[in-house]
Amino acid sequence: MILYNSLGQTKQEFIPHTAGKVNMYTCGPTVYHFAHIGNLRTYIMEDVLEKYLRFAGYDVKRVMNITDVGHLSSDADTGEDKMLKGAKREHKTVMEIAKFYTDAFFEDCKKLNIKRPDVVEPATNCIDEFIHMISVLLEKGYAYIAGGNVYFDTSKLDNYYVFGNMNEDDLAVGVRDSVEEDNNKRNKADFVLWFTKSKFDSQELKWESPWGVGYPGWHIECSAISCKHNGEYLDIHCGGIDNAFPHHTNEIAQSEAYLGHKWCKYWFHVLHLNDARGKMSKSKGDFLTVSLLESKGYNPLVYRLFCLQSHYRKPLTFSYDSLDNAAIAYDKLIKKISTLSPDGEPDMEAAKPYLNEFNDALGNDLNTSLGLTAVYSVLKGNISDATKLYLIGEFDKVLSLDLTKAQENKSENPINEEVESLIAQRTEARKNKDWATADAIRDKLKEMKVVVEDTKDGIKWHFEN
């Protein structure tokens, strides 16, 4: 497989640390509000990556954190505490907010056919791991205590800005004018590992530590949770492009300082979803959720298809017109597949060129658009219906669009025997030029919401959606 690596900004052959096994880590949600569909685009594409790696024969372990403490509204240790902000907004405790929005996130994932990671770890479960990692960084001289907080010292590194095109001026992005700069830092790029002097008097979640009662910084969470579950070597780290700096930059800094060797080989970043106002963001107030799309009559899998129609390394612009186009394409695709007959066995030799086409697409930096083209190639191909259904079922292990579900439901529906009998009677009536009987049967089928199509390959039928 060829995969674009943000660390180096080139396409590279994917070679995991241990042959046949892939350790994967995903930056999970900060659970202070609903995920918007821009957030979910990232998780959809990460889901496709995981499923394609499994499809390609790898044994994949995917770990994801849940940030339920420590994430401030600027990724650079400034601004409001997001969890505290959510709790105040809804007059609930931080843990009540965290549970509600964690459940809501996974409900959205379920609707979008996003597989739950093998390990899901809330940050609040790992305080001991955070304290241990910070202690080691202090012992090694990579961290210092100032003003009651523990900071990572970026001046100890030969190269802090590992993703390129970044500098300390970028740390100001997202910081509100009313937020004072942290004068305890020795260098502007330094970041907090542990807060004991919280700027928030009402901070709910605090723990004992060697440096006083406090709570972890956001960046230490992902490093410690990944090391806890994936060990010292990580193959792929995933996230949105806005996580690359400073969050992922800080993860690399502290993880490699702690471990004493290179940590993660490949960095997979998904670009933004934009709307008419620019990048979709919760900070703008109103934002689109899966539930909102459902309330407008859209199947969540239409949004998944919309995402798969574009490459993950390209910004994607959302509009209802483009979603409508995806809905039309999805409806036509499902109807076409539902007309295929499952009778017979697939021809595995005939299937090979189509499998190769799909692998060539997904294996080249996860080109989901060409992967969808492979589905249409199958439908147009001069192969049996059984072979087509086999191939589409295989592809859908990665695409996860429920492409064969309507056909499977049709096969399991007892009413199908009646439909098949009526169609046979209609065919016989037409052969005998008994148009009255043929029309009567057609009307009955219409009442049953059955659509009949006369094609060159014979009669095809499906239920109306």
Residue ranges and their predicted role:
Residues 92-96, 106-132, 142, 244, ...:
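Non-catalytic interaction-recognition regions
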Residues 59-61, 141-147, 382, 451-453:
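Short, well-structured beta-strand/strand-turn elements
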Residues 8, 17-113, 454-461:
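N-terminal, positively charged nucleic-acid-binding surface of large information/translation enzymes
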Residues 279-282, 286-465:
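Structural preference for alpha-helix termini/caps and helix-kink/transition segments
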Residues 63-69, 98-105, 115-130, 148-157:
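Short, glycine/charge-rich beta-strand/loop segments that flank catalytic centers
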